[in-house]
């Protein structure tokens, strides 16, 4: 295998690992009920985007936004998350 292929494989692994860590931190922050209705999809410029599966779930996370933000900051302090953005969408497993 080439050095470039090895580097790309390592980068892909690192991205998958970061996605898994982000989702685990979200689940730990929001609890099992909300975790089953939502997925943390990305963190960009200090904003974590969370996809929720329904308008009911959107209302629930919106009502709990400040608490969820405090918890996710504790779970991922190195990410310096300053805001949560919620969107209704399809939850891909």
Model regions and ranges:
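Single-stranded RNA-binding regions, centering on S1/OB-family and related RNA-binding modules
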Residues: 32
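A short interface-forming secondary-structure element
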Residues: 45-65
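N-terminal presequence-like segments and adjacent domain-start helices
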Residues: 1-28, 36-42, 78-93
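Short, non-transmembrane amphipathic alpha-helical segments
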Residues: 58-80
């Amino acid at each position: 295998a080439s050095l470039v292929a090895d580097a790309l494989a390592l980068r892909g692994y690192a991205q998958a690992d970061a996605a898994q860590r982000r989702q685990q931190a979200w689940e730990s922050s929001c609890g099992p009920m909300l975790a089953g209705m939502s997925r943390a999809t990305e963190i960009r410029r200090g904003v974590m985007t969370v996809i929720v599966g329904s308008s009911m779930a959107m209302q629930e996370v919106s009502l709990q936004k400040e608490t969820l933000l405090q918890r996710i900051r504790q779970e991922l302090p190195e990410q310096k998350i300053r805001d949560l953005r919620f969107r209704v969408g399809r939850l891909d497993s």
